UniProtKB/Swiss-Prot annotation:
Keywords: Chloroplast, mRNA processing, Plastid, RNA-binding, tRNA processing. It is found in: Plastid, Chloroplast. Usually encoded in the trnK tRNA gene intron. Probably assists in splicing its own and other chloroplast group II introns. It holds the Pfam family MatK_N. It comes from the Eukaryota. Its main location: plastid. GO terms for biological process: mRNA processing; RNA splicing; tRNA processing. GO terms for cellular component: chloroplast. It comes from Mentzelia laevicaulis (Blazing star). The keyword DNA repair does not apply. This is Maturase K. Belongs to the intron maturase 2 family. MatK subfamily. InterPro entries: Domain_X, Maturase_MatK, Maturase_MatK_N. The gene is matK.
Length: 504
């Protein structure tokens, strides 16, 4: 973030929260473009480079200076030659630049507010995999879990309201409202199952920022008020992942009086909360009655104080020992490993049954095959097929793309307790790559593999296998190394979900 700070004239703009002048700066669009190129994705994003150039940015800024407010309207875009096949190009560029403007000054404020505070370093906490060690440590001792479907706002203005507390620039807020209503026109009305249907797939960064700020409204009340009753410090680490400290402090001052008495009635010192995508999990060591109290408290909080309609069926309460959590591409559960211990006391011996709880994570095969079939790597039954759209690429590019996808999936799902699903996914991608190359060279798969040999297989040599082979070079082929490879590996550098791991 230090490299971005020099771009901002803090005394001129940030002192009064004036963000709108930054929309006319060329480097803002360069930062947005770099973010699009550097984000971690599984599948390629073709054509992104062709849609953004310095010439288009200059013309866009010139037209904004001319106060031609029709440049990003849906009616004008059909007649504009610069749009080409993408009629909302200008609006996409401005929205991506706008979210960069909003995010970076807010991050700078966050950094200044955290100076002198002892908070766990955020590098590891930003990783998605950091959630699973937390579950391994805490969920073994809990009884009930509530799967919560976070309600979506019924009106676009609700997404703008959280920003009004710290953005005093009316022009920026009006521009944001304009984006939201334009997306609504382009993508039709919202549907109950897809709250992000307002937005095209390429503008999800703006939506995620607004959605996080909206959800943080009630999380700030729930987490910070309840954190005073928690025995562990996990809540502090969790708040690190939300990125909205300034808003949290303001919300607590406003709403603490209303909710403190209510929360005190059913405080729970063994409650844990985590949020992912449009869902959240609330786990507790308490009873079913206590979980039902939390359920109706959240419903009343959403409806009465945040004007968001929700129904009781959106919160499912289950006993943790009989329930699997389906989130972030994993099926997570707590299972009992039975064991029998023989105890000898003088002349008598006893057999004692002992059950040890174990946190288990597996990768569901059916959603993975559905994702691969949607990406045209196999059919709905899991049989590999060729990728015709990549047949025009060079052999090295085709192998590199398939190999990168395979390594990314193995990297993301390295925490699986059972590797059978990963082996099958690797087989599908490997054979799909062979079929694509055979299609390009007008040959059969058998003849092509016979000619290429084992060189094709080396591209699908996963990172975990390389690490084990370097760490245990002599024992890599023994049963000991196979046992190590079956263990879960959590990485602390994964900051986004792979497309094929997102089954929504």
């Amino acid at each position: 973030m230090e490299e971005f700070q020099r771009y901002f004239e803090l005394d001129r703009y940030q002192q009064h929260d004036f963000l709108y002048p930054l929309i006319f700066q060329e480097y803002i669009y360069a930062l947005a473009h770099d973010h699009g190129l550097n984000r971690s994705i599984v599948l390629e994003n073709p054509g992104y480079d062709n849609k953004s150039s310095l010439l288009i940015v200059k013309r866009l800024i010139t037209r904004m200076y001319q106060q031609n407010h029709y440049i990003i309207s849906s009616n004008d875009s059909n007649q504009n030659p610069f749009f080409g096949h993408n009629k909302n190009l200008y609006s996409q560029m401005i929205s991506e630049g706008f979210v960069v403007i909003v995010e970076i000054p807010f991050s700078l404020r966050l950094r200044s507010s955290l100076e002198g505070k002892e908070i766990v370093k955020s590098q590891n906490l930003q990783s998605i995999h950091s959630i699973f060690p937390f579950l391994e440590d805490k969920f073994l001792h809990l009884n009930y879990v509530x799967d919560i479907l976070i309600p979506y706002p019924i009106h676009l203005e609700i997404l703008v309201q959280p920003l009004r507390h710290w953005v005093k620039d009316a022009s920026s807020l009006h521009l944001l409202r304009f984006f939201l209503h334009e997306y609504r026109n382009w993508n039709s009305l919202i549907t109950p199952k897809r709250p992000s249907a307002y937005f095209s797939k390429r503008n999800q960064r703006l939506f995620l920022f607004l959605y996080n700020s909206h959800v943080c409204e009630y999380e700030s009340i729930f987490l910070l008020t309840q954190s005073s009753h928690l025995r562990s410090t996990s809540s502090g680490a969790l708040l690190e992942r939300i990125y909205f400290y300034g808003k949290l402090e303001h919300s607590v001052e406003v709403f603490a009086k209303d909710f403190q008495a209510i929360l005190w009635l059913f405080k729970d010192p063994f409650i844990h909360y985590l949020r992912y995508q449009g869902k959240s999990i609330l786990a507790s060591k308490g009873t079913s009655l206590l979980m039902n109290k939390w359920k109706y408290y959240l419903l009343n909080c959403w409806q009465c104080h945040f004007y968001v309609w929700s129904q009781p069926r959106r919160i499912y309460i289950n006993q943790l020992s009989n329930h699997s959590l389906d989130f972030l591409g994993y099926l997570s559960s707590v299972r009992l490993n039975p064991s029998m211990v023989r105890s000898q006391m003088i002349e008598n011996s006893f057999l004692i049954d002992n059950a040890i709880k174990k946190f288990d994570t597996i990768v569901p095969i059916i959603p993975m095959i559905q994702s691969l079939a949607k990406a045209k790597f196999c059919n709905v039954l899991g049989h590999p097929i060729s990728k015709p759209v990549w047949a025009d690429l060079s052999d090295s590019d085709i192998i590199d793309r398939f190999g990168r996808i395979c390594r990314n999936l193995s990297h993301y799902h390295s925490g699986s307790s059972k590797k059978k699903t990963l082996y099958r996914i690797k087989y599908i991608l490997r054979l799909s790559c062979a079929r694509t190359l055979a299609r390009k060279h007008k040959s059969t798969v058998r003849a092509f593999l016979k000619r290429v040999g084992s060189e094709l297989l080396e591209e699908f040599f996963t990172e975990e296998e390389q690490v084990l082979s370097l760490t245990f070079p002599r024992a890599f082929s023994t049963s000991t190394s196979r046992g190590l490879y079956r263990r879960r590996i959590w990485y602390l550098d994964i900051i986004c979900i792979n497309d094929l791991a997102n089954h929504e």
